[in-house]
């Protein structure tokens, strides 16, 4: 992650929304450069760390929050749950998301794990912590990203436009108080990981329910179709 001004790293709407934590973003860039200087790598690659904030702030209608990036080298791409198009096999959580997607919407299983089309259509795929040390899950929790992503979540919720937050798992459900401002609905279920998917994630219909909540608030539904 390069030492550049926030408005050079993210979309203009996000630059304004994240202005209260601009110094924290700078500090996190310094932290990551110090990690590299000490011989410790991080994921995703530098240009993708803030990728979730490169899509228009004003167009976000769905928020899906992950915990931290995939720690497997080659998997994390800066969007929660998404992987690069060539990744095989898919992470188990993403495979379960796709199974529910197919069951809920009746679409065929996607050909790859790239969720970029969702991000382009107004789905914010945000990890609570934006980086991780390879093969070391949760290694960057408590380092400072939480303040940045809390600011992002609160800024989204405070807009005067409808949004639905899809909260998978207990960690995500703790974010609900941040969504109290504005016209924001939420859908909660167990996490899609293999440890909990069978306890209520499967059958939860998050995609169709989110669209029902959006249209009920006068907003356009999301086109969830993936190639």
UniProtKB/Swiss-Prot annotation:
Q: Where in the cell is it found?
A: Cytoplasm
What's the catalysed reaction? Hydrolyzes single-stranded DNA or mismatched double-stranded DNA and polynucleotides, releasing free uracil
Q: Give a Pfam family name.
A: UDG
Identify the InterPro entries for this entry. Answer: UDG_fam1, Ura-DNA_Glyclase_AS, Uracil-DNA_glycosylase-like, Uracil-DNA_glycosylase-like_sf
Q: What enzyme class is recorded for this protein? A: hydrolase
User: Where does the record place the catalytic residues?
Assistant: 68 (proton acceptor)
Q: Which GO terms describe its cellular component?
A: cytoplasm
Give the highest taxon in the source lineage: Bacteria
Does Acetylation appear among the keywords? no
Sorted keywords for this record are: Cytoplasm, DNA damage, DNA repair, Hydrolase
BP GO annotations: base-excision repair, AP site formation via deaminated base removal
- Check the record and name the PROSITE patterns matching this protein: U_DNA_GLYCOSYLASE (PS00130)
* UniProt-listed Enzyme Commission number(s): 3.2.2.27
Primary localisation category: cytoplasm
Any one GO MF term held by the record is:
uracil DNA N-glycosylase activity
Q: Which HAMAP family match?
A: UDG (MF_00148)
Family per similarity comment: Belongs to the uracil-DNA glycosylase (UDG) superfamily. UNG family.
Task performed by this protein: Excises uracil residues from the DNA which can arise as a result of misincorporation of dUMP residues by DNA polymerase or due to deamination of cytosine.
PANTHER family in the record, alphabetically? URACIL-DNA GLYCOSYLASE
Q: From the Swiss-Prot or TrEMBL record, give the protein name.
A: Uracil-DNA glycosylase
């Amino acid at each position: 992650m390069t030492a550049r001004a926030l408005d050079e790293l993210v979309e203009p709407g996000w630059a304004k929304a994240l202005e209260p934590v601009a110094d924290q973003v700078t500090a996190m860039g310094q932290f990551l450069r110090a990690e590299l200087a000490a011989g410790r790598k991080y994921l995703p690659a530098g240009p993708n760390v803030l990728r979730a904030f490169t899509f228009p702030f004003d167009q976000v209608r769905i928020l899906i929050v992950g915990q931290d990036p995939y720690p497997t080298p080659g998997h994390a791409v800066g969007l929660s749950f998404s992987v690069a198009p060539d990744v095989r096999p898919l992470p188990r959580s993403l495979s379960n998301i796709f199974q529910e997607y197919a069951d809920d919407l009746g679409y065929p299983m996607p050909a790859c794990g790239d969720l970029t089309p969702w991000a382009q259509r107004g789905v914010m795929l945000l990890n609570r912590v934006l980086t991780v040390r390879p093969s070391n899950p949760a290694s960057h929790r408590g380092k400072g990203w939480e303040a940045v992503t809390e600011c992002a979540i609160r800024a989204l919720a405070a807009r005067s436009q409808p949004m639905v937050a899809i909260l998978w798992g207990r960690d995500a459900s703790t974010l609900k108080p941040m969504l109290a401002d504005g016209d924001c609905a939420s859908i909660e279920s167990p996490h899609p990981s293999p440890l909990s998917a069978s306890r209520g994630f499967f059958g939860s219909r998050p995609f169709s329910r989110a669209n029902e909540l959006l249209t009920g608030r006068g907003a356009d539904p999301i086109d969830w179709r993936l190639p």
